[in-house]
């Protein structure tokens, strides 16, 4: 059997202990983008959300939001475990480790934000504890968590694992993000929807980064294997947001949501250099106004472009960033 080619980004070298000179400008710019996008949970105003929660939402809508937040709160912990126990030790280049280090900080903020939202909305201690322990107590969350965890605990190749976690951040969050943006379109829950915009932008960048790292591997997955991982994630997400926790609870169409998940998967496949599988268009035109890069904002609030401008100005002009590795939802097919 022929030996596999060595992977430079996975091969230990003394250079990994020093940040400069930059060897991978695209990775460095991704890191600076992440740094420029830093935010904290204290910046999200939840004062109106309590009024909307009590007076403007139906019981079905409250049920949906509770369980979506329970999934989000649990999933960020899984992403954190993967970063700290696998990817940070797998990848041997300092620019990528800088990104992962910052991603760990941001995932902690996401986890804090989701936990704070549950703490704010759910007054009953027993119910709140049930939701905080969603991986153990809510079967549809358990199934998604088990799928993600098998890529942390298993012996799969790095290429398989990086694709799987691109699916976690690019597909497993897609239906829930979309449903919360639907509430934003209706002018409800401004704190929840503002934090959702910040978090979806962050996760879009994390997914972009996974695609970029994958593109640097010399040995990539064969197309059938790559598609199998992505399509498996699509089926699990479809079951979650169309059946187990149906988006109909917030007034969204099941068939269109299923198509939207397929659309997101095709975008991810393209970003990974693979042919699309589903060949569908985005059924939610209003989502095109909110790409996963956070390009716009429906209302008067800041965010979309919320970032530290001085940080990004320091990298433009000296870091070659290639849009081929950007995973977004506002492009034509």
Swiss-Prot record:
Binds 2 iron ions per subunit. The keyword Chaperone does not apply. Its cofactor is Fe cation. SUPFAM superfamilies: Ferritin-like. Fe cation 1 binds at residues 76, 107, 110. It comes from the Eukaryota. The active site is at 114. Disruption phenotype: No visible phenotype, due to the redundancy with RNR2A and TSO2. Rnr2a and rnr2b double mutants have no visible phenotype. Disulfide bonds: none annotated. Gene3D superfamilies: Ribonucleotide Reductase, subunit A. One of its GO terms (molecular function) is ribonucleoside-diphosphate reductase activity, thioredoxin disulfide as acceptor. Signal peptide: none annotated. Fe cation 2 binds at residues 107, 169, 203, 206. Its EC number is 1.17.4.1. It holds the Pfam family Ribonuc_red_sm. Keywords: Cytoplasm, Deoxyribonucleotide synthesis, Iron, Metal-binding, Oxidoreductase. It catalyses: a 2'-deoxyribonucleoside 5'-diphosphate + [thioredoxin]-disulfide + H2O = a ribonucleoside 5'-diphosphate + [thioredoxin]-dithiol. It is found in: Cytoplasm. One of its GO terms (cellular component) is cytoplasm. GO terms for biological process: deoxyribonucleotide biosynthetic process. Heterodimer of a large and a small chain. Provides the precursors necessary for DNA synthesis. Catalyzes the biosynthesis of deoxyribonucleotides from the corresponding ribonucleotides. Belongs to the ribonucleoside diphosphate reductase small chain family. This is Ribonucleoside-diphosphate reductase small chain B. The lineage of its organism: Eukaryota, Viridiplantae, Streptophyta, Embryophyta, Tracheophyta. The gene is RNR2B.
């Amino acid at each position: 059997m022929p030996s596999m080619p060595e992977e430079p980004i996975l091969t230990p070298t003394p250079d990994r202990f020093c940040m400069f000179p930059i060897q991978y400008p695209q990775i460095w710019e991704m890191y600076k983008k992440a740094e420029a996008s830093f935010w904290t949970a204290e910046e999200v105003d939840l004062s109106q959300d309590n009024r909307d929660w009590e007076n403007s939402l139906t019981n079905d809508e409250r049920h949906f939001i509770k369980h979506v937040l329970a999934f989000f709160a649990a999933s960020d912990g899984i992403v954190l475990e993967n970063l700290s126990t696998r990817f940070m030790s797998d990848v041997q280049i300092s620019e990528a480790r800088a990104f992962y280090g910052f991603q760990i900080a941001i995932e902690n903020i996401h986890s804090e934000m989701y936990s704070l939202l549950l703490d704010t909305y759910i007054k009953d201690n027993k119910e709140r504890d049930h939701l905080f322990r969603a991986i153990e107590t809510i079967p549809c969350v358990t199934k998604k968590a088990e799928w993600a965890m098998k890529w942390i605990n298993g012996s799969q190749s790095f290429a398989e694992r990086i694709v799987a976690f691109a699916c976690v951040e690019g597909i497993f969050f897609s239906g829930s993000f979309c449903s919360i943006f639907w509430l934003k379109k209706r002018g409800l829950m401004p704190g929840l929807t503002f934090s959702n915009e910040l978090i979806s932008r962050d996760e879009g960048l994390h997914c972009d980064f996974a695609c970029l790292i994958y593109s640097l591997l010399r040995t990539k997955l064969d197309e059938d294997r790559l598609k199998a991982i992505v399509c498996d994630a699509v089926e699990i997400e479809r079951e979650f947001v169309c059946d187990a926790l149906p988006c109909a609870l917030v007034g969204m169409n099941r068939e269109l949501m299923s198509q939207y998940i397929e659309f997101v998967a095709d975008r991810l496949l393209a970003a990974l250099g693979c042919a699309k599988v589903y060949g569908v268009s985005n059924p939610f035109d209003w989502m095109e106004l909110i790409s996963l890069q956070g390009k716009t904002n429906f209302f008067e609030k800041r965010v979309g472009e919320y970032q530290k401008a001085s940080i990004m100005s320091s990298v433009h002009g000296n870091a070659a960033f290639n849009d081929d590795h950007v995973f977004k939802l506002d492009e034509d097919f």
